[in-house]
Amino acid sequence: MPRVKRGVTARARHKKVIAAAKGYRGRRGNVFRIAKQAVMRAGQYAYRDRRNKKRTFRALWITRINAAVREQGMSYSVFIAGLKKAAIELDRKVLADLAVRDKAGFAAIVQQAKAALAA
């Protein structure tokens, strides 16, 4: 069986890692052993933060809704309870968007929630 030299394969593998580390500072961008670790860590951060992003955005939407609802003289938790009672099935993303872009429309939804709680 002939001897297999791995020069081509190794070079391709190294190039792939170095390309992934493009833009990294210092030796993290041009030394294979260090770049490999940096790329792996970057992947771990990306994996973790794809999950954290969902939490962060939900928190942002809730904060925006709460601020807009308090202008109408209500708290967030009472507002959400009113929406449930009024059978309004808008998610927090849409509610936050309405609160920012369409204040009159959002105020109408708040009034419906208030009416449902009063009934």
UniProtKB/Swiss-Prot annotation:
Alphabetical list of Pfam families matching this protein: Ribosomal_L20
What Gene Ontology molecular function terms does this protein carry? rRNA binding; structural constituent of ribosome
Could you mention a single GO BP entry for this protein?
Answer: translation
Q: Which CDD domains match?
A: Ribosomal_L20
User: What keyword terms does UniProt attach to this protein?
Assistant: Ribonucleoprotein, Ribosomal protein, RNA-binding, rRNA-binding
Give the top-rank taxon of the lineage listed in the UniProt record for this protein.
Bacteria
- CC annotations in GO: ribonucleoprotein complex; ribosome
Its family remark reads: Belongs to the bacterial ribosomal protein bL20 family.
Q: What does the record give as the function of this protein?
A: Binds directly to 23S ribosomal RNA and is necessary for the in vitro assembly process of the 50S ribosomal subunit. It is not involved in the protein synthesizing functions of that subunit.
Q: Which PANTHER family match?
A: 39S RIBOSOMAL PROTEIN L20 (PTHR10986)
Instruction: Spell out the HAMAP family in the cross-references.
Output: Ribosomal_bL20
State the protein's name.
Answer: Large ribosomal subunit protein bL20
Originating species = Bordetella pertussis (strain Tohama I / ATCC BAA-589 / NCTC 13251)
Q: What is the lineage of its organism?
A: Bacteria, Pseudomonadati, Pseudomonadota, Betaproteobacteria, Burkholderiales
Gene responsible for this protein: rplT
